[in-house]
Amino acid sequence: MLQIILVLAMFVILVIPMGRYMYHIATDQKTFADRVFDPVDRLIYKICGIKGGDMSWKEYALSLVTANAVMILVGYLILRIQGFLFLNPNGIGGMEESLSFNTIISFMTNTNLQHYAGESGLSYAAQMCVIIFMMFTSAASGYAACMAFCRGLSGRKLGNFFADMVRIITRVLLPLAFIVGLLLISQGTPQTLAGNITVETIEGTYQDIAMGPVAALESIKHLGTNGGGFFGANSSTPFENPTVISNMIEMLSMMLLPGACVVTFGLMLHDRKKEKKTVRKPLMGRQGAVIFGAMAILFVIRSEEHTSELQS
């Protein structure tokens, strides 16, 4: 019980400042990180030819679908020809047609249905350039759509999909994934480009131990509420989730951004109806508190039901 209370307390402590930070990003207000990320964003806009300006809902939706379609095509091709690409120390061949299609669609839609064992089915290049890349972009696409939806409900213009996607990746997902990745490495999660290691067991037989850029994938997998994993058994393997602390880190990572979106939504609605006398911004706004409370009640009810199922 103490462990559960500790994780939930840490979640509440982290989710409010994270939600306020995302609120400032969603409403294009100044943040403490602007000095670092503004030049990065401008460089990306210049390279990609992204122009500012608000979009209609049709333009926003079309941009989302088109961008994701292009990434699906590129990712599919990489999976098919991974055997000829770099960063393939274990000599893994190209993925079969239908499995490539299933994999790329699954990870682009944030469904993350995985019908392959990552340690034997994907090269490091495919893991990084397809799976990890899609975990970033699918999550960013979802959060961009969420931001646009919240803006619409609060009476604002929808914004620009490409600008939203870039800002979410550079200002939210990448920094958090870097921090979480370092924390997982400190707990024993591998992060290497070396090939598999062959060791002799205590029984006198030999076994291949799969390695790779595991921490990089695990960090964004949980932050972006993705599924799957670097290994076929996902986070039940010691390398993906080696300690109790890594388990807490991964649970908090999964909960952080979805909870922060509720805080962001509440603050955006509060802005639309606040009185001029209001000086101090609330923690999450009245609507945000209602939604957050409803989610907490459902969480407790479902947890009780799940506990009863396990005991029976």
Please place each PLM-identified region on the residue numbering.
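Membrane-proximal intracellular helices of multi-pass ion channels
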Residues: 1-312
